[in-house]
């Protein structure tokens, strides 16, 4: 049993709440649009972890009343074949969101494939157009994991404005958009990475600490400011003494929970929120279809 002072930020509970809200919205919109929202998930190869993630996404789609179009391709599928499939999905009126499940085999250019996706169907929120909208503070599809972090902070009424937020990791998937979203909410943001010299000094000054480095138990109790909010984005598979695999984050959970005021667990913290934001992005695109239907009706009167 963990002896902890920190309150748990329950991503699983909030994700369920968001999914219920999306389900109700879909039930309202579907009669007007004439179909359910649709999410296409492309997976290449036979990565077992990816297969689990894809199944979880498909189950979540079913739960909220969304159609899922899973496309599984052999590991040797070519770049041009996938680009052709993406173009077909861009044109498919049943599809509101397109997701490429990562990682991809080494011979594929994931960035080029991402660029191929219609920005209005970019369920992951990673297309340059959507990242540009984020930089400009304009509405649009947001990167799922950072958006999940922001939703969790909001749910627990945790103040971001004026706080010092330190993000560890600078990936396009999490670190960079995370920094931008915190900045948008008027935090003072520092992004640390593998070449940062004074990591402990920075993390100890953080009111909000987001760990997204992909390194198991990187953040130890002495690196955390007492009373901080600690968000653990890391998902690392390690083996215990018996050789059994288990998932841990980037944060030494048991130790840091005695120092922080709020903390996310792994699993059950940011993982479920990422999926909830993926569904939310797809419904965001679907919602635009209703606006199009209403405009058509107005034009026909």
UniProtKB/Swiss-Prot annotation:
Protein origin, superkingdom: Bacteria
Subunit structure: Homodimer.
NCBIfam families for the chain: PRK10792.1 (NF008058), PRK14186.1 (NF010783)
InterPro entries on file: Aminoacid_DH-like_N_sf, NAD(P)-bd_dom_sf, THF_DH/CycHdrlase, THF_DH/CycHdrlase_cat_dom, THF_DH/CycHdrlase_CS, THF_DH/CycHdrlase_NAD-bd_dom
Catalytic reaction(s) noted: (6R)-5,10-methylene-5,6,7,8-tetrahydrofolate + NADP(+) = (6R)-5,10-methenyltetrahydrofolate + NADPH; (6R)-5,10-methenyltetrahydrofolate + H2O = (6R)-10-formyltetrahydrofolate + H(+)
PANTHER family linked to this entry: C-1-TETRAHYDROFOLATE SYNTHASE, CYTOPLASMIC, C-1-TETRAHYDROFOLATE SYNTHASE, CYTOPLASMIC-RELATED
Residues given in the record as NADP(+) binding sites: 169-171, 194, 235
Name of the featured protein: Bifunctional protein FolD
Keywords: Amino-acid biosynthesis, Histidine biosynthesis, Hydrolase, Methionine biosynthesis, Multifunctional enzyme, NADP, One-carbon metabolism, Oxidoreductase, Purine biosynthesis
Membrane spanning residue stretches: none
GO CC terms in record: cytosol
UniProt gene name: folD
PROSITE patterns reported for this sequence: THF_DHG_CYH_2
A GO molecular-function annotation: methenyltetrahydrofolate cyclohydrolase activity
Gene3D superfamilies to which the protein is assigned, alphabetical: Leucine Dehydrogenase, chain A, domain 1 (3.40.50.10860), NAD(P)-binding Rossmann-like Domain (3.40.50.720)
Pathway info: One-carbon metabolism; tetrahydrofolate interconversion
HAMAP family assigned: THF_DHG_CYH
């Amino acid at each position: 049993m963990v002896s902890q002072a920190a309150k748990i930020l329950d991503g699983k509970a909030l994700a369920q709440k968001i999914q219920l809200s999306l389900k109700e919205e879909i039930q309202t919109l579907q009669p007007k649009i004439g179909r359910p929202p649709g999410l296409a998930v492309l997976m290449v190869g036979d990565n077992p972890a990816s297969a689990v993630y894809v199944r979880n996404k498909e189950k979540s789609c079913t739960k909220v009343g969304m159609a899922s179009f899973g496309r599984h391709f052999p590991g040797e599928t070519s770049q041009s074949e996938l680009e052709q499939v993406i173009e077909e999905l861009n044109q498919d009126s049943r599809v509101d969101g397109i997701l490429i499940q990562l990682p991809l085999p080494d011979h594929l250019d994931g960035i080029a494939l991402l660029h191929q996706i219609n920005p209005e169907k970019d369920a992951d929120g990673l297309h340059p157009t959507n990242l540009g909208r984020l930089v400009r503070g304009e509405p649009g599809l947001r990167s799922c994991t950072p958006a999940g972090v922001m939703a969790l902070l909001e749910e627990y009424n945790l103040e971001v404005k004026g706080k010092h937020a330190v993000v560890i990791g600078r990936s396009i998937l999490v670190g960079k958009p995370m920094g931008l979203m915190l900045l948008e909410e008027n935090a003072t943001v520092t992004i640390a990475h593998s070449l940062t010299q004074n990591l402990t000094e920075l993390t100890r000054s953080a009111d909000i600490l987001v760990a997204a480095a992909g390194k198991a138990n990187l953040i130890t109790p002495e690196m955390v400011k007492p009373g901080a909010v600690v968000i653990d984005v890391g998902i690392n598979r390690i083996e215990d003494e018996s050789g059994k695999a288990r998932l841990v984050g980037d944060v030494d959970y048991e130790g840091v929970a005695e120092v922080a005021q709020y903390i996310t667990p792994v699993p059950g913290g940011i993982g479920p929120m990422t999926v909830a934001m993926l569904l939310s992005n797809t419904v965001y695109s679907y919602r635009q279809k209703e606006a199009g239907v209403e405009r058509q009706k107005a034009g026909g009167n």
